[in-house]
Amino acid sequence: KTTPGLRIFEKYAFHCGGGINHRLGLDDAAMLKENHIEWSQGISESIKILKNTIPWTKKIIVEAETPSQAKEAVEAGADGVLLDEMSIQTIKKLVPELRQLTKTSSSKYVSKNIVIEVSGINPNNLSDYIDTGIDLISTSAPITKSKWIDFSMRFS
């Protein structure tokens, strides 16, 4: 959620402020978002295709909108799952289930070090997520809530 044409500057400013950028571009990691999942043959098949086409050094992250999507992503071998706009109650219940799944699944694809991330975080609800067991938060607040200086350059 960056300003067109200013992405690299906004990402750099965020980094200078102490933030860790999720990705600088689509080539940093494979991220399956809702449109990819809807367009494709599903999460499991998409992960299978990605594992056979991208370098093994690239991570595969799935943006899950439901608990069943998150579980499917873990079973299929995603390196990370972003729990997209889920309620705090759902997250508190789901995170331990996903952690348990990495220990008990018979799937040979399950990553034992799955990274669980949540979105929908802002300064007003950040403290609600402290004891949920998540690894990362994803927020666009530093970009979308920032005040910009109105400047221009004129030539004569």
Question: What name fits each language-model region?
Answer:
Residues 154-156:
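Short hydrophobic/aromatic patches at helix-to-coil boundaries
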Residues 1-76, 80, 92-93, 97, ...:
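Acidic/glycine-rich phosphate/pyrophosphate-binding loops and surrounding catalytic core
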Residues 85, 120, 141:
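Short secondary-structure boundary segments
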Residues 80-88:
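Extended hydrophobic secondary-structure segments
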Residues 87, 121-123, 130:
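Catalytic-pocket segment enriched in acidic/His residues
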Residues 102-111:
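Intrinsically disordered, low-complexity Ser/Thr- and acidic-rich flexible linkers and loops
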